[in-house]
Amino acid sequence: MEMMEKEFPDIRTIRLDRNYGFTGGYDRGLEAVDADCFILLNTDVEVPSDWLGPVLRTMENCPEVGACAPKIMSWYDRDSFEYAGAAGGYIDSLGFPFCRGRVLGMIEKDNGQYDNAADVMWASGACLAVRSSLFRRLGGLDDRFFAHMEEIDFCWRLQLEGYAVRIVPQYRVWHIGGGTLPQTSPRKLQLNYRNNLLMLQNNLARTFAIELCKAGKNTAEAAGRACRKARRRILLRMTVDGIAAAAYLLKGSAASFMAVVRAHSEFRELGRWPSRQDVQAFAEAHSDSEVKGIMPGSIILKALVHGRRIFEKLNSLCR
């Protein structure tokens, strides 16, 4: 902060009394900002001089777009996509995230294969433009997350409100990554497992209810079935997490094993299951909404089967 105030005295700074994490920091800071569009930008992101133009034009000319983002490149290997964002993200049926340009540990070079403007499931919070009115209507980022996966949850909620998340490929930014927690941190692993479950709990039932209504079910029946289906899906995800935890233990990583255990414990403490009545009311008010970018099945299994050919199949696999 001292450097900012000294080197860039014309920039307004907002000081918080403590570290509220990625989520709480943005939520509290943006309360004091009056603008039509918010730009969420990490301190470890390098941007070109003309990067804002395509973003602002997209937001001005496309009212259906609630948020948009550039292609996120690796600062270390500037022609390769960055792990946590790449050219826009998807999730599979269990909530595991992956990207155009990054699946599991496989990362592509940017050869122009994603130079089309595309609507995706989520975009990286490292560099994300959001309509301020929509950000406030949705209550901002979920403060329970602290950090990690909050942008996926936000983009999911944004789509449920009927807005699109769009990648604007005319510009690229370069992200160092790992600024909050290093990749090897057990705390990072814990947050990822915990927040993935919170994200599913926030959004699955409402998504299922809208799908069931479009399939011809009345809203009351759709809400009941959606809530039960969401609970079963989350239980399945927790079972998969348990298998992963056992694998960590067998490999001798007690810290990773305990990270999963703590993640599930914190999820039970922080989680809030939506009521059937709330899900029904939401489905009645959002019958036209559609969530794009959720792949049926498991990205892990599909990647094991297809290897690097999985990148050629992403458009057909993700609805």
List the predicted regions and their residue ranges.
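Acidic donor-binding segment of Leloir-type glycosyltransferases
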Residues: 1-15
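Short aromatic/hydrophobic "clamp" motif used to bind/position activated sugar donors
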Residues: 38
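Conserved donor NDP-sugar-binding/catalytic core segment of glycosyltransferases
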Residues: 46-96
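A short, conserved alpha-helix in the catalytic core of glycosyltransferases
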Residues: 115-172
